[in-house]
């Protein structure tokens, strides 16, 4: 079960959270991930609905105690780019990074991959190289508020000042395990009643 038993939470639908549960399967086994998923469902304040910002808005409105959301959406709301209402809501909540005494917080990623047999391999590699350039990484940090992937590019000040950087990230779980465990993740989430 969830570590904050008795707290009502809001979270997106099961499809959106498959990578999170897949990482739990990889690290803790399918049985433990199934129990965790049951704990999530039993603590849901409502049936999953809306995007990450809707989860944060629900906590700010007192509809739930905890929201599971990607932090870059909180920073986006704090920026005011999504309007005064969302900015005000974001100021009412605080980010919390779970699993700090173990492998660290699960991190979703934005990624690019080259398809085997791609007809324009050189251009595809050039695109990936560009995405990893300081120019592109600064775009990600300043416009989507994601964490940069390369040294020399700093996170957006909204992230640094409001979310902090002093947390342990799960850098040990191989991202490839997310794909490998997707079917099992959906299976345990569905069995738990996670819509």
Identify the residue ranges that each predicted region occupies.
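Mature extracytoplasmic/periplasmic domains
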Residues: 110-170
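Sec-exported extracytoplasmic/periplasmic mature domains
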Residues: 25-30, 42-45, 60, 64, ...
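Single conserved hydrophobic/aromatic residue that forms the stacking wall/gate
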Residues: 1-6, 10-11
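Flexible, solvent-exposed loop/hinge segments that line or gate ligand/substrate-binding clefts
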Residues: 88-119
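Soluble non-cytosolic domains of exported or imported proteins
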Residues: 15, 31, 50-53, 68, ...
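Short secondary-structure boundary segments
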Residues: 12-13, 71-72, 143-144
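Ligand-binding pocket segment of bilobal, Venus flytrap-like solute-binding proteins
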Residues: 16-19, 23-98
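Extracellular/periplasmic bilobal clamshell ligand-binding domains
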Residues: 157-195
